[in-house]
Amino acid sequence: MQNITQSWFVQGMIKATTDAWLKGWDERNGGNLTLRLDDADIAPYHDNFHQQPRYIPLSQPMPLLANTPFIVTGSGKFFRNVQLDPAANLGIVKVDSDGAGYHILWGLTNEAVPTSELPAHFLSHCERIKATNGKDRVIMHCHATNLIALTYVLENDTAVFTRQLWEGSTECLVVFPDGVGILPWMVPGTDEIGQATAQEMQKHSLVLWPFHGVFGSGPTLDETFGLIDTAEKSAQVLVKVYSMGGMKQTISREELIALGKRFGVTPLASALAL
C-alpha cells in the first residue's frame, strides 16, 4: 500500500505551510491553503481513505467543482503543526456530483473540518478556473505582515496599491501585471467575503483583505507562494522607505511600460495611468 503522506501533494502542502509559518505569515491558526487535484492524483491512495467518509454540505452549490478533489488545511489548525501530523491538520475532500457538498476522504482526524474560509476558497477556485482556463489550482490565504501594514497607510484602492507595489520592487510588475484587488473590511469566514473575494479574483491573482491578510492564486504551490512572497517583499521595502521619509526617486511610468514590453506582460491600465 502506498502511503499518502509521501505523495507529492501532501509533501507540497507540508512545505508550503511550513515555509509560510517560518515567514511569520501564519500565527496560531491563521491562514489557509487549498490545492485542486485530479482523480488520477489520489487514485493510488484509495487504501488510505476513511472507510466511511463524512459528508458536509456546502452553504451554496458549486456545480463547477462537481466531482473535484482538493487537499485543504483544517479549521483551527496551526500551520506550524502540519509537518508534525499531516493527517490531523490536512484533509482530502471531494465535491459530490452536483456540487452541493463534499466527502472527507482522508485526514482531518478527530472530527476536524476544513478551513472556515472554504467558501472563499471554493468560490475563488471557480473564478480562477474560468479566468485561467483551468490553469490555476491553488488558493492561499495568509497574514503577510507588511502587506497588512500598508493597508493602514495607503489608500485602499486597487490602482494606488498596485502602483506602489510595482514601484517597491522591479519584479512586481512582471509577477503580477494584473495588479492587486482590494476589498473593504469584511467579517471573515462568511459567504459574503467569499463572494467579494471571488469577484476580485475574476481580474486579479492577488486580493487584499485590509487589516487582515491576502489571498493569492496560481497554478502550483510554488508559484502561489512566490506570488505572495514577491508582493510581501515589495511591501517590506515600502514600509522601510516610508519610515525613512518617503521616496525621493522611483520607477517612472515610462520605465514600467518598458518593463512590461520586455517581459511580454500587459500592466493594469488604471495603475499605469497614475
Swiss-Prot record:
Q: What is the effect of changing N29A?
A: Severe loss of enzymatic activity
Top-rank taxon: Bacteria
Cofactor mode of binding and number, as noted = Binds 1 zinc ion per subunit.
The cross-references to Gene3D superfamilies, in alphabetical order and at most eight, read: Class II aldolase/adducin N-terminal domain
Q: Binding positions for Zn(2+)?
A: H141, H143, H212
GO-annotated molecular function: aldehyde-lyase activity; identical protein binding; metal ion binding; rhamnulose-1-phosphate aldolase activity
Expression triggers = Induced by L-rhamnose via the RhaR-RhaS regulatory cascade. Binding of the cAMP receptor protein (CRP) is required for full expression.
Query: What's the Enzyme Commission number for this chain?
Result: 4.1.2.19
Q: Name the Pfam families on file.
A: Aldolase_II
Family matches, as SUPFAM superfamilies: AraD/HMP-PK domain-like
Please tell me, according to the UniProt entry, what happens when changing E117Q. Answer: Loss of enzymatic activity
- The catalytic site is made up of E117
**Main site of residence?**
cytoplasm
Pathway field: Carbohydrate degradation; L-rhamnose degradation; glycerone phosphate from L-rhamnose: step 3/3
Can you cite a GO biological process for this protein?
rhamnose catabolic process
* Obligatory cofactor(s): Zn(2+)
Q: Which residues form the signal peptide?
A: none
- Please provide the record's keywords in A-Z order: Cytoplasm, Lyase, Metal-binding, Rhamnose metabolism, Zinc
Cellular component terms per the entry's GO annotation:
cytosol
Catalytic activity reported: L-rhamnulose 1-phosphate = (S)-lactaldehyde + dihydroxyacetone phosphate
PANTHER family listed in its UniProt record: FUCULOSE PHOSPHATE ALDOLASE, RHAMNULOSE-1-PHOSPHATE ALDOLASE
Whom does it interact with, and what assembly results?
Answer: Homotetramer.
* Family from the record: Belongs to the aldolase class II family. RhaD subfamily.
UniProt cross-references to HAMAP family, sorted A to Z: RhaD
Instruction: Give the protein's function.
Output: Catalyzes the reversible cleavage of L-rhamnulose-1-phosphate to dihydroxyacetone phosphate (DHAP) and L-lactaldehyde. Also catalyzes the dephosphorylation of phospho-serine in vitro.
State the name under which the record lists this protein: Rhamnulose-1-phosphate aldolase
- Species name for this entry? Escherichia coli (strain K12)
Q: Which gene encodes it?
A: rhaD
